[in-house]
Amino acid sequence: MNNSNNGVEWWLIRHGVTAWNLQRKYQGHSDEELLPGEASGLTPLRSKLAGQSFAGVYCSDLKRCRQTLQLIRPDWTGQAVYDPRLREMNFGAWEGKTYEMLEHNPLYRAWIDDPKLHTPPEGESWELFQNRITDFQRELLQKSKELAVSGNGNPSILLIVTHGGVMSTLNMLMSPDADFWDSKVLPGEIMKLKLRSNELGW
């Protein structure tokens, strides 16, 4: 393929601040709302994204991500794809709890030491979590390939509003040298992954 200059970028957004973020509670699939107004921490991001063109927008179907999209780009709320695969890991019985509340639980300690081998009670295994993110990534790569082929030489940007664990997984999948724990993205922050057709073997 000769159009290697037709870059595609994934702009990954972590949802804004919730009360549980401040209380350092596991949220997972719990449908928590953002803090109101400036407390959500999204004002700088809203300014940064104002007027930016996107080739597509994807969003976790959980309330805190929907509200984030509504605040940062309300013009896209009706066109975005709301995908449950973009949810955070399901922490099961540990949701709503803090590290301090769980630190003496033997299963929790084992999970902290090796989350690939242990699963939260009533929660989601590491394998299931990784598999659904990988499934989404494959579809997004196909979309990116189509954008690269049809592009005019300018980067096409896909916006993904999601959660910290999902962002870490996508970064790990797209960056061979990256580890899941390398990404430390705070609520309301952005991570940009720049793809090139020649880098992906298209």
Segments and roles (model prediction):
Residues 1-8, 153-154:
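Extreme N-terminus of proteins, especially the signal/transit-peptide cleavage junction
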Residues 33, 75-132:
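Phosphate-handling substructures
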Residues 175-202:
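Domain-level recognition of soluble alpha/beta enzyme cores
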Residues 71, 169-173:
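Active-site signature of alpha/beta-hydrolase-fold catalytic machinery across serine-
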Residues 54-61, 148-152, 157-161:
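Short glycine-rich phosphate-binding loop at a beta-alpha junction
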Residues 8, 13, 17-76:
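Active-site-proximal alpha-helix that buttresses catalytic centers in soluble enzyme cores
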Residues 164-168:
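GST superfamily/GST-like fold recognition
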Residues 43-47, 130, 134-145, 171:
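Generic structural signal for well-ordered alpha-helical scaffold segments
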